[in-house]
Amino acid sequence: MRKQGVSSKRLQSSGRSQSKGRRGASLAREPEVEEEMEKSALGGGKLPRGSWRSSPGRIQSLKERKGLELEVVAKTFLLGPFQFVRNSLAQLREKVQELQARRFSSRTTLGIAVFVAILHWLHLVTLFENDRHFSHLSSLEREMTFRTEMGLYYSYFKTIIEAPSFLEGLWMIMNDRLTEYPLIINAIKRFHLYPEVIIASWYCTFMGIMNLFGLETKTCWNVTRIEPLNEVQSCEGLGDPACFYVGVIFILNGLMMGLFFMYGAYLSGTQLGGLITVLCFFFNHGEATRVMWTPPLRESFSYPFLVLQMCILTLILRTSSNDRRPFIALCLSNVAFMLPWQFAQFILFTQIASLFPMYVVGYIEPSKFQKIIYMNMISVTLSFILMFGNSMYLSSYYSSSLLMTWAIILKRNEIQKLGVSKLNFWLIQGSAWWCGTIILKFLTSKILGVSDHIRLSDLIAARILRYTDFDTLIYTCAPEFDFMEKATPLRYTKTLLLPVVMVITCFIFKKTVRDISYVLATNIYLRKQLLEHSELAFHTLQLLVFTALAILIMRLKMFLTPHMCVMASLICSRQLFGWLFRRVRFEKVIFGILTVMSIQGYANLRNQWSIIGEFNNLPQEELLQWIKYSTTSDAVFAGAMPTMASIKLSTLHPIVNHPHYEDADLRARTKIVYSTYSRKSAKEVRDKLLELHVNYYVLEEAWCVVRTKPGCSMLEIWDVEDPSNAANPPLCSVLLEDARPYFTTVFQNSVYRVLKVN
């Protein structure tokens, strides 16, 4: 957006300088006439010798000429102020036209951004409704659609809004005894629940205002379901908690698309670049996001703020002003990105890992880079405070990299005094940064006692080193944590996204290598030249990092695909392809690319729109109804993590394990609970469950036999973890045949079996 304004300003100013030059030429003649007049009037020009006495006719002619000259001089002095006023008015008129053009450009950019934001919001709402028929589901069915950790997060939103007051609800989730019974935990600190707290406050405020004025907030009706399902009541409108909750999420992600447009427009220098970013996102929508299928996940709240943060960082890298506001905005967007999601710190670490080599070779001036590091440090500190001293923020690779970067910046001059070559100077700084970051990370983890917590970096390390144990297999056997599908690059190619980005990356890489080679050859820093393209180098490095992450963990495509869409906007950049646009019409090139993109892109959109379904899960509904009406409110349950989240959400019964698997203590509990799918003895498992105060165990027959891929059935995972019992029969099969004497079957349907722990 801002880039567009700058370019229009340049065009206007160049026109102004030309007209000003023309006015300058006309005005330049007037002092010459004036000077000539003054010379003649004062007798500055000498007559030939012997001609001092002139004839009367000559004197008269001289008088007439002198009178004419005096008249011209008088007119010049009289017209001078008017000419000045006229020139000033012309300049003012041009300035107004320039401001109007910039305002028009800004308004156009903002208008398009609002339009694409609304378009994306409608797209998300349509896909979500088509998939589940959410508007016609009962409250219980809507809660069941939030499976696994989604149900866990939504349960805290439900707790707050159903409490007598907002503050009481806040106190309840900060002193939660239901989730890891009998432990009392601060759920905000453990599960990053600021989104639920904020949305709950909005919901309570909205309902309070609507009730004050007596306005209806929802419409309810009875829905007749297929036999043997009974009739249920379904409500639609912002007064329904589930509708309000997902509505806020879709609005936020709709706004994200408007931000993508402005991001692409600013990076490429043209609004057409922003449109290419948006179209690429829509054409590759299934590869770019999953918010329409899984709204409550942490990434749905967090990722839009990463887009904002990267847009602000691009502005900082491109401009050379000392304005503090972009740096403050960078700090706040970092906080907004980190608070909702535990994996956000690792993504910010990849940013620092991309920025540091740019600083080393001279793409970023030290003072600017130092400010960026300080803002990141402040954002970590603020997040640590707001998350009630969550030590994960201080023991991450991100925090360690910030400290090492700060130390290297301070010691830079001392390293230079070693008198090494430029290349060795770079290698020393890079080696010190990597080694120092890794060592500092492990030291802080040990000191703060969080070395046993699983992070995204641990999963990536397990992938690279091919290390497996019970905990890593629980993660990596899930489809979203598998390697990238082989068909994904083909899908990128069909929409022309991959070829376009590869061409852009090659041009940036070629220019970067040429610049760095020249720096090494001349042994000087090309700060002015390199600073102009630092944002391009940064985006290229981030693209490489996101590509590596997406290949290792499929779920991280959510970072790669949108970033590729932003990079695709650079096909409109005259900075990169000005040589091409001077030979071929700019519009023809872009129109041709968009035409080819839209062939497969439109087919992808039609495939998404064709997904029509209606949610129902009768076995789980029967289970939840039985628990709600056939057990006491203090009965404690254990079982598969996804099912436990649903039990807590819909029945409010205590559970001992849940899907938020990063915490070391929780993983130890889950390991005990999942031992029913091992080859251990029934007595040993029963005794361990009693230590956790479990009253009922929910056994799922599918978990006894399901195998997502080789080595990923629960029995195979346990054989890796517990080889000493590999010869014993599976406990799950024993319990399905006859659970006595250590367990008693009290409920059973086609999927679930509830065992009372004796």
Swiss-Prot record:
Bias kind Low complexity: ranges: 7-18
Membrane topology: Multi-pass membrane protein
Enzyme class: transferase
Nuclear domain ranges by topology: 1-107, 216-241, 284-296, 365-371, 444-488, 555-758
Perinuclear space topological intervals: 129-194, 318-343, 393-422, 510-533
Assigned keywords, A-Z: Developmental protein, Differentiation, Disease variant, Glycosyltransferase, Membrane, Nucleus, Spermatogenesis, Transferase, Transmembrane, Transmembrane helix
Cellular compartment(s): Nucleus inner membrane
Annotated transmembrane regions: 108-128, 195-215, 242-262, 263-283, 297-317, 344-364, 372-392, 423-443, 489-509, 534-554
Pfam families: Dpy19 (PF10034)
EC number(s) on file: 2.4.1.-
Superkingdom as given in the UniProt entry: Eukaryota
GO cellular component: nuclear inner membrane; nucleus
Region (Disordered): 1-58
Further comment: It has been suggested that DPY19L2P1 is an inactive pseudogene from which DPY19L2 has evolved by duplication. However, expressed transcript sequences derived from the DPY19L2P1 locus are known to exist.
Quaternary structure and interacting proteins, as annotated: Interacts with FAM209.
Family of the protein in this entry: Belongs to the dpy-19 family.
Chain's role: Probable C-mannosyltransferase that mediates C-mannosylation of tryptophan residues on target proteins. Required during spermatogenesis for sperm head elongation and acrosome formation. Also plays a role in acrosome attachment to the nuclear envelope.
Protein name: Probable C-mannosyltransferase DPY19L2
